[in-house]
Amino acid sequence: MSIVLRKSNKKNKNCITSKFYTIHIIKISTPVFRAPIAIGESPYVEWSCLQVVFRKDMVTKKTTFAQLITRLNHFLCQALKRRDSKTYILCRTAVFGAMTPFSPRKSHINNKLPMQPRKKKIVIIYVVRFH
């Protein structure tokens, strides 16, 4: 699943700008348990799109990107359990591309992650496995 982290601004009745962090989940891949797999065929089945919105109070100075993804992991596990009676395990394989800062201060970002200011997206690959 590819995730794009985007900062969106919404105005309320008092014209005060609130900041929301929206994560667009483009796809979730589920392994297909059958053999053999044809040459060039993807061994995964793609799921439908999801969207997660984090309120501004969920992203603080002490919240790192890794902690935000941990919350997203929990959300997805719960959503998948509600969707089907089977038990799912969400295994994360992270492929970090360029990163968008959560705010003008870079202190919110885990410094271990690579950052390229020209591109503004974070790509993370998830694999959902049946148990």
UniProtKB/Swiss-Prot annotation:
Open reading frame that exhibits genomic organization compatible with a translational readthrough-dependent mode of expression. The sequence can give a readthrough frequency of 9% when cloned in a plasmid with reporter genes. When the initial stop codon is bypassed, translation will go on to the second stop codon 321 bp downstream. It comes from Saccharomyces cerevisiae (strain ATCC 204508 / S288c) (Baker's yeast). Changing residue 22 to S: In strain: XH1549. This is Bypass of stop codon protein 4.
